[in-house]
Structures are given as C-alpha cells and as structure tokens.
C-alpha cells in the first residue's frame, strides 16, 4: 500500500488537524472556573470544588438535534445547529435543578470539511457561552461509507451540579400549584420529520403569510432557546416545585414528567402564546389541532410549577413575559387537560 493509504480510503487526517486548529478560538470563549487542562487531552477535566456546592449531585444529559440537521444541510447553514445541540442537553438538566458545568460534543461526517465543521463547533461554543458551560472535549469522526460526503450527525453531552437539597424531581409539586411558561424561540429541535414532510416541496425562500415577513428557512432553523440563565435564579431561591422542558411529545408527553401520577395539569389554551410557525404547520400539514400539542412546544419551551405565593417573585426575577397558563389539579383521567 502507498504512504497515503488512509487518505485513499477517504479519511483526510490533515483536514482533521485543521479542524482542531480552527475551533480552538471558539472553545476558548467557553472557559469557566473549574476547567483543568486544555484541548487535546485524552479526557476533559473539571474541578468540582470550584462550584462551591456543599452537597454536590452530578446531573447529566445527552441529546442530538434529530432531522433538523437535514434542513441545515439542505440550506447550507451550519452556524446555529450547534446551539440547538447544547440547548437540548442543558435545558434537560436544568429541569432537574442542575447548574450546567461542562459540555462535550460528537460530530460524525462523511467528509471532513474544516470550514463547515468550524461553523458547527462555533455554534456549539455559542450555546456553551449562553449556558455558562465549558466546552471541555469532543470528537470529530470522519466516516466515509457510513455517511454521504455532505452529511453529518451531531450529538452532545452536558454535566451539571445541584445541591442535594435543591434537586427538582417532581416530589414537591402539589395540587394548586400555578403553571408558568416561558416562550420558545420556534420549533426548537423536535418534530422535524413531520416538519420536513409538510414543507418537502418548498425551497425555503418562501415568505408565507403566517410567518410575518420571515423566510421559511430562517424560521425552520431558528435555534433552540437556552433557558439556563432564566431558570437558575429561581432554582437558587427554591421558588419552583417542578420544571418541564417541552421537547419531543409536546405538552402531552413532557408536562407530566414533572409531577406524580396522582396529579394532572389543567392548561388554558387561550393563555398559550402560539407562534406563527405552528399555525402554518397545522394549516399546510392538515394536522389535527389537538395533535399539535402532542408533537410541538406550541410557543412554550419551559414550564414551571410554582406555589401561588411565589408567583409574583418568579415574575419579578424573570425579565421577560411570563405566561400563567394553568394549574396543577387532582388527576381525574388524563395527565394533561387542555381547555
């Protein structure tokens, strides 16, 4: 075999080295107290004592962005998909009461294109900055034959810490708690197999009447909102009994994850700030209205269960619109009742 046998098999080692050099400046943006060592070691290190947590419990989460990646590839826009990946992970662990500490990413591709992969990792770094987490490691795997040359997949792993006494596991949610919602930025990163089917014959350049002047592709690739900085102060003051990250499965699947089986969520649909893209999906996809709440976030990306006496303090700490969308009630049938 020749000296460049690996390259002939489709793996460009030099391109891999270039990716590492390109992403160093982006990784540097995510530095935070506790990080030990630098990029390129066999393992990322973090000094937990720097968090100041007295009884630390580590909470971890992993996720990807599903077939939203296919739209990023279709529209050749790769600079925000990394933020989606970070958001999906850190929003999950914040729902358990954790302060996210560090993040690792995994990218697999058919062909190592340094400029494109730099955009992806720059998006990851931006998500880390918004979350206050350090990007302490990652892997870029070039896998010709497994993926097409233009294809790639992206996954992430987040680790956070919580005071043992402040873990949010749903046990404190009680009948009478008020449900408060924070707005989503769009579809986020779930339901895209259906989204792609609905808009399969569209170029993405269309400005649909429902989308208020925005191009379809820009709305579909709007990055997932990160809720860490909004939620952490509420957790620190122990103002919330439960948190639900509204992801795949919409309201119906995710809201019950924050309370016990004997309770239910009663939601006033008129209080939900439904985004234009969901109205467009329902219309052009001919999707039953009730099914929309089983698939999408419908405009609410994070939900809190809060004691009535804490509602005003929560609203005071959150420098944004807060939607009072329902109550926790005794279960008498379905776990989520939308009226």
Swiss-Prot record:
A Pfam family recorded for this sequence: AIRS_C
GO molecular-function terms, A-Z: ATP binding; phosphoribosylamine-glycine ligase activity; phosphoribosylformylglycinamidine cyclo-ligase activity
A biological process term (GO) from this entry: adenine biosynthetic process
Keyword match S-adenosyl-L-methionine: no
Cross-referenced InterPro entries: PurM-like_C_dom, PurM-like_C_sf, PurM-like_N, PurM-like_N_sf, PurM_cligase
Entry-linked CDD domains: PurM (cd02196)
Keyword annotations from UniProtKB, A to Z: ATP-binding, Cytoplasm, Ligase, Nucleotide-binding, Purine biosynthesis
Reaction(s) catalysed (UniProt annotation): 2-formamido-N(1)-(5-O-phospho-beta-D-ribosyl)acetamidine + ATP = 5-amino-1-(5-phospho-beta-D-ribosyl)imidazole + ADP + phosphate + H(+)
Cellular component, GO, one term: cytosol
Entry similarity comment: Belongs to the AIR synthase family.
Protein name: Phosphoribosylformylglycinamidine cyclo-ligase
Phylogenetic placement of the source organism: Bacteria, Bacillati, Bacillota, Bacilli, Lactobacillales
């Amino acid at each position: 075999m020749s000296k460049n046998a690996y390259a002939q098999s489709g793996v460009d080692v030099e391109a891999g080295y270039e990716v590492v050099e390109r992403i160093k400046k982006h990784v540097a943006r995510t530095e935070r107290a506790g990080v030990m060592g630098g990029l390129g070691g066999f393992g990322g290190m973090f000094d937990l004592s720097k968090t100041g947590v007295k009884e630390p419990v580590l909470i971890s989460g992993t996720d990807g962005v599903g077939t939203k990646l296919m739209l990023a590839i279709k529209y050749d826009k790769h600079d925000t998909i990394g933020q989606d990946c970070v958001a999906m992970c850190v929003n999950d662990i914040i729902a358990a009461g954790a302060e996210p500490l560090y993040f690792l990413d995994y990218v697999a591709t058919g062909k190592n294109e340094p400029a494109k992969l730099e955009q992806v990792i720059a998006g990851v770094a931006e998500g880390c900055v918004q979350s206050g987490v350090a990007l302490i490691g990652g892997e870029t795997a070039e896998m010709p034959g497994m993926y097409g040359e233009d294809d790639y997949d992206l996954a992430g792993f987040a680790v956070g810490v919580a005071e043992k006494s402040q873990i949010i596991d749903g046990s404190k949610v009680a009948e009478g708690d008020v449900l408060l919602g924070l707005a989503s930025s769009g579809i986020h990163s779930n339901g895209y197999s259906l989204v792609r089917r609905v808009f399969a014959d569209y170029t993405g350049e269309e400005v649909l009447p429902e989308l208020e002047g925005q191009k379809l592709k820009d709305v579909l690739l709007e990055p997932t909102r990160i809720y860490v900085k909004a939620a952490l102060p509420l957790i620190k003051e122990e103002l919330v009994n439960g948190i639900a990250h509204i992801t795949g499965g919409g309201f119906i699947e995710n809201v019950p994850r924050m309370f016990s089986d004997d309770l239910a969520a009663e939601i006033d649909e008129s209080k939900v700030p439904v985004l234009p893209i969901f109205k467009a999906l329902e219309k052009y996809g001919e999707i039953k209205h009730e099914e929309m709440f089983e698939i999408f976030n419908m405009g609410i990306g994070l939900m809190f269960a809060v004691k009535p006496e804490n509602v005003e303090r929560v609203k005071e700490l959150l420098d944004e619109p807060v939607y009072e969308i329902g109550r926790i009630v005794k279960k008498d049938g379905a776990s989520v009742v939308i009226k």
